[in-house]
């Protein structure tokens, strides 16, 4: 949660989602994750997750690890296929003093919040390519978050035509990006310039945005004490 701002005469804030509410949160997100994992296990399929290397990937890993620890979802192989995300995660590990209180407690009591026996960080291009030859169930988290470059595009190329696979969208997708076309439900999408049929299911998680929604923005402003006149 953000630290309440100090008293001020003028407050300028961002308002990316100032006109809407995030529809999903807490239990709704957990239930959707449970459904995806159950589907992947039942169909021995892959969950391909385009994710930003900074922040979003680490958040996803921590969320998944927490759900497994709580017995809310069954563990399955998770591959973090982004060299940049791996380097950023190392920075996160080295600076637990920057965490909020809850995350810091997890780090000190349970060890590395970004590691588990079922989590593997992929480094080499050769290992990344082998993921496309593997059978599921598994989760592949790779950048770029909007599917415009990076290793995730290769995973989409190899997995998008399998109707048992799932593409989980966990972040904002700008117009004219491959990610936005997936969200919009295009049946044929361009991958490396080649029109490619989409048979995989696309599931959108709306509650994971790093941007505050209307209620959160209002709560932030109302927390100013004393309130500006």
Residue ranges and their predicted role:
Residues 13-16, 51-52, 81-83, 143-144, ...:
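Fold-independent oxyanion-binding glycine-rich loops
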Residues 65-69, 108-229:
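C-terminal regulatory/interaction regions
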